[in-house]
C-alpha cells in the first residue's frame, strides 16, 4: 500500500500551451501552483507567464473550471523565482521538446528542489533515462516521466514512465495523486520513443495517410470513414491533425523517424510531400484558419491533391460501406470489409490490419500488458475500443491468419512477422483473469494499488465484467441495488437516463424502500449522462392527444418525486457526471447533497423548449434565495444571481461553474475522477447517516420578492427584447419564470409555503405547454436535437 503523494504546492516549468494548461488543471483541483518561464525581455520579469495565464481564459475548450481561478496561479521566472521551488512537493517540467534545453534546466533547478519533492517531465517522447543523466544522485530516485494528453483538463490519460532508478513508492504516490486529485487514468509506459499513446496513435495516423494515397481517397472521405462510424471522435484523422497543428504533427513524425531507426516501419516515418507543402505555405491548421481543411464563408473546403487546390468537402462514406460498418457482429463486419472490392472498404481493412500488426509487434517493447495499449489509445485518442480489443472482438485467430496472409503476399506495410505469442492458440489478449503480458507470458490482473479500490466500476475492457450488485427493486424505469452494505443505489434504465412515468414512480418506491431497509440512497448512473431531463416525446404525445389533465398529473407527479427525494428520512445523494438537464438538475437540487464530477454540465434548460422548470426547480431557487437573504433581507438580490441562468437556459461548463450559476450549492462536492464518484457519494451518504441525518423541516415561511420583483425582472427583460437579445416568446417564458421565482403577484416580502410555489410552477408550465410555439420548440428539439428560437 502506498499513500498518495502529499502535494501542498506544485510548480510547472514552462508556460507554453501545455505547461499553462497543466498549471490550470492543478489549480482546478485545488493545488496551489507556481507557473515558471523565462524572464521577459521587456516589461515585468514575469511577463511571459502573465500573458500565458491571461490567455487561459481565451482557450476553447476552457482549461479552467472557472475563469476566476486564473488569479490563483502564481507567476514566476527562472532568474528571480527559483527560491519558490523549495516549498513545492511536485515539479512538472513542460518546456519545448529539446533534450539539451531540458537537461540545462534540470541542472539549474536541482539545488532548489526539496529533499522530498518529485520531479516529473511532461515530455511526449524523449528518453526519461537520458533526461535523468544530469540529475544529482539524491534526486534521481524521485524523477520520472508523466505525460499528459492535450487538453489536459479533458483527456483522461496520463502516461507514467519510470526511469531505471525511480523509487516504487514515489511512482505509487504520484499515481494515486494523478488518479484521485487530478482525475486521470494512469498507464505505465516503458521508456521508448513516444511511449504508448503517441507511438500507436501516430502510427495509426501515418498508416491512414499511406492508405489514403494507396487507395486514391480524399481527405474528407477518409475522415467520414475514420470517425464515429468506427467508434472514434468526429474529428477523425485529418481534422484532428488540423486541430493539433500540422507543424506539430510534422514534428512528432520527425521525432519517430529520428528516434526509431530500427523500426521495421521506419520508411513511413516521414512527412508526406503534401504536408510539407502546406506547412511551407503557412497553412498550419485550425490555429491559422487553414490547413487540410479551411472554412470559406459557411462552406468547408478541403485540399485536393490532384488539383493542388481546395475543393468543397463533400465526399462521404459510400452507402455499401456504411452498410458493412452497421453490421453488429465484428467478425462478420471485418470479413466483409476484407472481401469487398470497394476502395473505401479496402482502405479500412488495410488500416486496421497494419494497426493490429504494429501493435502486436511492438507490445513487448512499449508496455507491460495489452491493457496498457488499449486504455492509452482509448483515453488519449478518444477511441471507443483499443486496437487489441477491436482485433479480439473480430475473432483473434481468424484476423491473425488474415494478417499473416497479407504479410506473406506483400500487402502489409511491413514484412516483419507477427510475434509467436499471437499464434499460441489464444482467443485474445483480454479476459476475466487479466490482460496478456509478453514479458511474463501470462495474463496479469489490474493494479492492486489502494487508490483503485475507490473505483467500483472501472472503465471496462472487452471481456471484463464487474458484479452488478444485488437487485432490490426494478421496474421499466429504474433499478435499485446494493453491495451487501447499508447504502442503496438507484440507476435509470431509459435512453439518455431521461425521466419517464416509470422513473418517477420507481424513484418514489425506491425512496420508501431505502427509508425502511437502508441508511442512505445514491442516485447514480452506470454511464453518462446523469439525466437529459424529462421524456419530451411522451409529454408531447399527451399534449397532441389533448390529454391536458393527464399532462398536469405528470407534472404533479414530477414535483411529488422531487419532494419525496428532499424529505426522505434517509440522505439521498445525487452522483452527477455529464449532462444533468431539466428534471435531472431538479432531482440533484432536491438531494441532501450532490457529488458532481468536474465534467458535469448542469442546467435548467426548459426555456429552450418553450417551458419552465416545473419539477420543483423554480420553487427550490425561491427557497434558497429566502434562506440566503435571511429574515427581512433582500430576496431579489439573491434571485438575480440565478434568474438569468434559468431564463437563458444556461448550462454550466463544469461543476465549479455550476456553483457560480447557483445550480449547485457551496456545500456540494466536486469530484475529479468520475470513476470514483459512486464511492464518494456512498461515503457522503454514510457520513450523513452516521451524523444522525434528519430531513429539513418543511419550508412554510418562504420570503418572496413578490410583485415588485416581477416588475423589476420584466424591466430587465424589456431591455433585452428591445436590444434583440431575446424573441417575444422568450420574453413571455422568462416573465413567467420571474412570476414563479418571485412567488406570484403578492406583496414584496410576503411569506408563502412550498405548495404555493409548486402550484405556480404547475400553472405556468401547463399553460406554456399548450401554446403552439412551445409545441413547435419541443418538436424541433426532438427532431434536430437543437433549440428553436421562435
Give the location of each predicted region.
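Short alpha-helical segment that forms part of, or immediately flanks, the ligand-binding pocket
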Residues: 586
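N-terminal glycine-rich phosphate-binding loop for ADP-containing cofactors
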Residues: 2-521, 525-528, 535-559, 563-570, ...
Amino acid at each position: 500500500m502506498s499513500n498518495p503523494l502529499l502535494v501542498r504546492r506544485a510548480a510547472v516549468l514552462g508556460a507554453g500551451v501545455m505547461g499553462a494548461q497543466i498549471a490550470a488543471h492543478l489549480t482546478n483541483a485545488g493545488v496551489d501552483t507556481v507557473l515558471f518561464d523565462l524572464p521577459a525581455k521587456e516589461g515585468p520579469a514575469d511577463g511571459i507567464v502573465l500573458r500565458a495565464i491571461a490567455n487561459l481564459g481565451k482557450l476553447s475548450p476552457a482549461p479552467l473550471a472557472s475563469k476566476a481561478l486564473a488569479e490563483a496561479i502564481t507567476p514566476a521566472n527562472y532568474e528571480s523565482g527559483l527560491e519558490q521551488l523549495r516549498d513545492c512537493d511536485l515539479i512538472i517540467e513542460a518546456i519545448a521538446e529539446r533534450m539539451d534545453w531540458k537537461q540545462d534546466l534540470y541542472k539549474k533547478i536541482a539545488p532548489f528542489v526539496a529533499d522530498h519533492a518529485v520531479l516529473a517531465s511532461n515530455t511526449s517522447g524523449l528518453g526519461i533515462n537520458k533526461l535523468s543523466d544530469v540529475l544529482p544522485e539524491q534526486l534521481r530516485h524521485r524523477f520520472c516521466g508523466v505525460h499528459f494528453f492535450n487538453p489536459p483538463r479533458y483527456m483522461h490519460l496520463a502516461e507514467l514512465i519510470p526511469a531505471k532508478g525511480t523509487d516504487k513508492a514515489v511512482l505509487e504516490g504520484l499515481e494515486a495523486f494523478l488518479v484521485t486529485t487530478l482525475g486521470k487514468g494512469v498507464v505505465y509506459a516503458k521508456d521508448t520513443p513516444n511511449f504508448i499513446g503517441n507511438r500507436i496513435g501516430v502510427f495509426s495516423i501515418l498508416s491512414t495517410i499511406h492508405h489514403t494515397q494507396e487507395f486514391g481517397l480524399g481527405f474528407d472521405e477518409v475522415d467520414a470513414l475514420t470517425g464515429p462510424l468506427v467508434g472514434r471522435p468526429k474529428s477523425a484523422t485529418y481534422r484532428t491533425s488540423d486541430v493539433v497543428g500540422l507543424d506539430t504533427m510534422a514534428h512528432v513524425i520527425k521525432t519517430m523517424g529520428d528516434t526509431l531507426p530500427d523500426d521495421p516501419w521506419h520508411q513511413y516515418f516521414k512527412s508526406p510531400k503534401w504536408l510539407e507543402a502546406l506547412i511551407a505555405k503557412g497553412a498550419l491548421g485550425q490555429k491559422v484558419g487553414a490547413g487540410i481543411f479551411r472554412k470559406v464563408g459557411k462552406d468547408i473546403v478541403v485540399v485536393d491533391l490532384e488539383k493542388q487546390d481546395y475543393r468543397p468537402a463533400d465526399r462521404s462514406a459510400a452507402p455499401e460501406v456504411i452498410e458493412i460498418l452497421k453490421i453488429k457482429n465484428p467478425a462478420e463486419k471485418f470479413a466483409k470489409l476484407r472481401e469487398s472490392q470497394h476502395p473505401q472498404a479496402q482502405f479500412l481493412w488495410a488500416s486496421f490490419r497494419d494497426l493490429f500488426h504494429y501493435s502486436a509487434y511492438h507490445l513487448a517493447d512499449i508496455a507491460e500488458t495489452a491493457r496498457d495499449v488499449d486504455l492509452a489509445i482509448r483515453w488519449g485518442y478518444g477511441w471507443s475500443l483499443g486496437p487489441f480489443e477491436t482485433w479480439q472482438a473480430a475473432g483473434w485467430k481468424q484476423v491473425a491468419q488474415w494478417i499473416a496472409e497479407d504479410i506473406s503476399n506483400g500487402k502489409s506495410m511491413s514484412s516483419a512477422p507477427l510475434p509467436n505469442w499471437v499464434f499460441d492458440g489464444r482467443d485474445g489478449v483480454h479476459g476475466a483473469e487479466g490482460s496478456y503480458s509478453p514479458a511474463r507470458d501470462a495474463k496479469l490482473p489490474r493494479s492492486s494499488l489502494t487508490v483503485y479500490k475507490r473505483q467500483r466500476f472501472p472503465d471496462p475492457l472487452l471481456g471484463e465484467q464487474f458484479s452488478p450488485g444485488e437487485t432490490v427493486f426494478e421496474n421499466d424505469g429504474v433499478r435499485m441495488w446494493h453491495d451487501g452494505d447499508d447504502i442503496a443505489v438507484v440507476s435509470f434504465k431509459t435512453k439518455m437516463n431521461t425521466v419517464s412515468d416509470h422513473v418517477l414512480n420507481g424513484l418514489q418506491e425506491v425512496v420508501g424502500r431505502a427509508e425502511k431497509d437502508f441508511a442512505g440512497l445514491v442516485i447514480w448512473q452506470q454511464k453518462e449522462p446523469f439525466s437529459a431531463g424529462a421524456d419530451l416525446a411522451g409529454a408531447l404525445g399527451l399534449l397532441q392527444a389533448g390529454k391536458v389533465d393527464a399532462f398536469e398529473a405528470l407534472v404533479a407527479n414530477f414535483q411529488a418525486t422531487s419532494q419525496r427525494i428532499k424529505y426522505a428520512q434517509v440522505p439521498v445523494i445525487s452522483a452527477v457526471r455529464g449532462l444533468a438537464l431539466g428534471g435531472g438538475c431538479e432531482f440533484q437540487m432536491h438531494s441532501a447533497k450532490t457529488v458532481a464530477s468536474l465534467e458535469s454540465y448542469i442546467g435548467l434548460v426548459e426555456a429552450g423548449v418553450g417551458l419552465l422548470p416545473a419539477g420543483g426547480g423554480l420553487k427550490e431557487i425561491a427557497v434558497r434565495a429566502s434562506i440566503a437573504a435571511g429574515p427581512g433581507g433582500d430576496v431579489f438580490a439573491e434571485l438575480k444571481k440565478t434568474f438569468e441562468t434559468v431564463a437563458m437556459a444556461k448550462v454550466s461548463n463544469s461543476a465549479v461553474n455550476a456553483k457560480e450559476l447557483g445550480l449547485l450549492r457551496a456545500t456540494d462536492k466536486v469530484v475529479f475522477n468520475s470513476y470514483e464518484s459512486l464511492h464518494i457519494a456512498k461515503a457522503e451518504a454514510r457520513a450523513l447517516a452516521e451524523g444522525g441525518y434528519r430531513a429539513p423541516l418543511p419550508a412554510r415561511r418562504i420570503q418572496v420578492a413578490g410583485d415588485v420583483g416581477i416588475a423589476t425582472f420584466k424591466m430587465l427583460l424589456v431591455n433585452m427584447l428591445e436590444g434583440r437579445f431575446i424573441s417575444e416568446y422568450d420574453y413571455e417564458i422568462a416573465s413567467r419564470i420571474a412570476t414563479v421565482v418571485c412567488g406570484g403577484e403578492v406583496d414584496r416580502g410576503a411569506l408563502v409555503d412550498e405548495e404555493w410555489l409548486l402550484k405556480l410552477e404547475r400553472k405556468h408550465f401547463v399553460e406554456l405547454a399548450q401554446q403552439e410555439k412551445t409545441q413547435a420548440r419541443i418538436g424541433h428539439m426532438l427532431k434536430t436535437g437543437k433549440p428553436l428560437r421562435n
